[in-house]
Amino acid sequence: RRLVEEAHIPPYASHYIGAGGVVLSESDELLVVRERFGFGGRAPMMKLPGGALQAGENLAEAVVREVLEETGVETRFESLVCFRHWHGYRYGKSDIYFVCRLRPVSTTITMQTEEIQECLWMPVEEFLGNDAISEFSKWIVRAGLENRGMVPATVGGFPDTREREFFVATDTSDGLASFRGRRGS
């Protein structure tokens, strides 16, 4: 097979794709990590567990895998709550970072020591009130707690969910009370 003259091929990889998980325990503690290495010359800060998607990996699978790899905590995907698009990331490429709400299936931490310096369950109010935590991290945690987000959906004509992922907005937004209430379901 040969490409035709009009074929559109990107000249190079243009984006990094990553995902982080907002994981809230039954006792209103947020699963957080501190990486071993800072970014942009800054000291490592507490943040959500997460990382890069692997080639061919779906978003929902990737965030569950990343949280498990970094923390040892098993989770189940609930929803996509927000994302950030940032230009000028590594090597001048753009970065898309998805924030997902996950439900913990286990709570025992087994920290991955190659990349992670510290991992713990932190009271959510302590996280939000901590001056040493970035405003971005606080903002995305609030987004994860205050809206129900978008849930996976099957779209007619696209039955293979391994090939394509679709997320649709839920019809209500009742915040933290709803998030806490759904844990048992």
Task: Go through the PLM ranges and name each one.
Residues 37-39, 53-55, 82-87:
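Short, catalytically relevant binding-site loops at active-site mouths
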Residues 11-13, 22-23, 69-74, 88-92, ...:
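Short, conserved, surface-exposed binding loops centered on an aromatic residue
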Residues 39-45, 55, 114-185:
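Nudix hydrolase/Nudix homology domain
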Residues 5-7, 25-27, 86-109, 124, ...:
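Active-site-adjacent beta-strand/loop module that shapes the phosphate/pyrophosphate-binding cleft
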Residues 6-48, 75, 79:
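N-terminal strand-loop-strand
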Residues 48-80, 100, 108:
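The catalytic Nudix box helix
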Residues 33, 63, 67, 119:
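Hydrophobic pocket/interface hotspot
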